[in-house]
């Protein structure tokens, strides 16, 4: 019985440690998101679009440190934060509304985080759909 109880105690310690790591990862992701939003706020009209992409990228980098179902929630929060940063930029006159959601080359930025393969159960990952990809044929 002692062996059984000791095993359960060790398992509990492992769960607590994993929860603490997840909590730490979420806190880091939130900190990076805040950094990115402050970065966007300090940019001029020309830099705002690039700044919004930076927020998304920093958040995406930190999301990889967070495991399990938390990833889905962090990704949703990050996307809403990026959308909010863009709205703030438009409201303050840093950028025109028609410039939001495009990178410096004018290509749409939507789907940055949505296409990231995420499995809350950590069982399997699927690649994003290939609808947006084109076949590449090298020139002879």
Curated annotation (Swiss-Prot):
Keywords: Acetylation, Alzheimer disease, Amyloid, Cell projection, Copper, Cytoplasm, Disease variant, Membrane, Metal-binding, Neurodegeneration, Nucleus, Parkinson disease, Parkinsonism, Phosphoprotein, Repeat, Secreted, Synapse, Ubl conjugation. GO terms for cellular component: actin cytoskeleton; axon; axon terminus; cell cortex; cytoplasm; cytosol; extracellular region; extracellular space. One of its GO terms (molecular function) is protein kinase inhibitor activity. GO terms for biological process: adult locomotory behavior; amyloid fibril formation; behavioral response to cocaine; cellular response to copper ion; cellular response to epinephrine stimulus; cellular response to fibroblast growth factor stimulus; cellular response to oxidative stress; chemical synaptic transmission. Cu cation binds at residues 2, 50. The modification Phosphotyrosine is found at residue 125. InterPro entries: Synuclein, Synuclein_alpha. Residues 100-140 are annotated as: Disordered. Phosphorylated, predominantly on serine residues. Phosphorylation by CK1 appears to occur on residues distinct from the residue phosphorylated by other kinases. Phosphorylation of Ser-129 is selective and extensive in synucleinopathy lesions. In vitro, phosphorylation at Ser-129 promoted insoluble fibril formation. Phosphorylated on Tyr-125 by a PTK2B-dependent pathway upon osmotic stress. The keyword Oxidoreductase does not apply. The modification Phosphoserine is found at residues 87, 129. Residues 112-140 have a biased composition (Acidic residues). The modification N-acetylmethionine is found at residue 1. Residues 20-67 are annotated as: 4 X 11 AA tandem repeats of [EGS]-K-T-K-[EQ]-[GQ]-V-X(4). Sequence repeats lie at residues 20-30, 31-41, 42-56, 57-67. Residues 111-140 are annotated as: Interaction with SERF1A. It is found in: Cytoplasm; Membrane; Nucleus; Synapse. Changing residue 136 to F: No effect on osmotic stress-induced phosphorylation. Highly expressed in presynaptic terminals in the central nervous system. Expressed principally in brain. Pfam families: Synuclein. Soluble monomer. Homotetramer. A dynamic intracellular population of tetramers and monomers coexists normally and the tetramer plays an essential role in maintaining homeostasis. Interacts with UCHL1. Interacts with phospholipase D and histones. Interacts (via N-terminus) with synphilin-1/SNCAIP; this interaction promotes formation of SNCA inclusions in the cytoplasm. Interacts with CALM1. Interacts with STXBP1; this interaction controls SNCA self-replicating aggregation. Interacts with SNARE components VAMP2 and SNAP25; these interactions allows SNARE complex assembly and integrity. Belongs to the synuclein family. Neuronal protein that plays several roles in synaptic activity such as regulation of synaptic vesicle trafficking and subsequent neurotransmitter release. Participates as a monomer in synaptic vesicle exocytosis by enhancing vesicle priming, fusion and dilation of exocytotic fusion pores. Mechanistically, acts by increasing local Ca(2+) release from microdomains which is essential for the enhancement of ATP-induced exocytosis. The 'non A-beta component of Alzheimer disease amyloid plaque' domain (NAC domain) is involved in fibrils formation. The middle hydrophobic region forms the core of the filaments. The C-terminus may regulate aggregation and determine the diameter of the filaments. It is linked to Genetic alterations of SNCA resulting in aberrant polymerization into fibrils, are associated with several neurodegenerative diseases (synucleinopathies). SNCA fibrillar aggregates represent the major non A-beta component of Alzheimer disease amyloid plaque, and a major component of Lewy body inclusions. They are also found within Lewy body (LB)-like intraneuronal inclusions, glial inclusions and axonal spheroids in neurodegeneration with brain iron accumulation type 1. This is Alpha-synuclein. It comes from Homo sapiens (Human). The lineage of its organism: Eukaryota, Metazoa, Chordata, Craniata, Vertebrata. The gene is SNCA.
């Amino acid at each position: 019985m002692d062996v059984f109880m000791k095993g359960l105690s060790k398992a509990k310690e492992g769960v607590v440690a994993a929860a603490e790591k997840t909590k730490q990862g979420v806190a880091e992701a939130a900190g990076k998101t805040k950094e990115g939003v402050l970065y966007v706020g300090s940019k001029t009209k020309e830099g705002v679009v690039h700044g919004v992409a930076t927020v998304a990228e920093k958040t995406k980098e930190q999301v990889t440190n967070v495991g399990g179902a938390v990833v889905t929630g962090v990704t949703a929060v990050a996307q809403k934060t990026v959308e909010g940063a863009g709205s703030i930029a438009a409201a303050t006159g840093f950028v025109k509304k028609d410039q939001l959601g495009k990178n410096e080359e004018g290509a749409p930025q939507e789907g940055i985080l949505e296409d990231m393969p995420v499995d809350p159960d950590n069982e399997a990952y699927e690649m994003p759909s290939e609808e947006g990809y084109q076949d590449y044929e090298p020139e002879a």
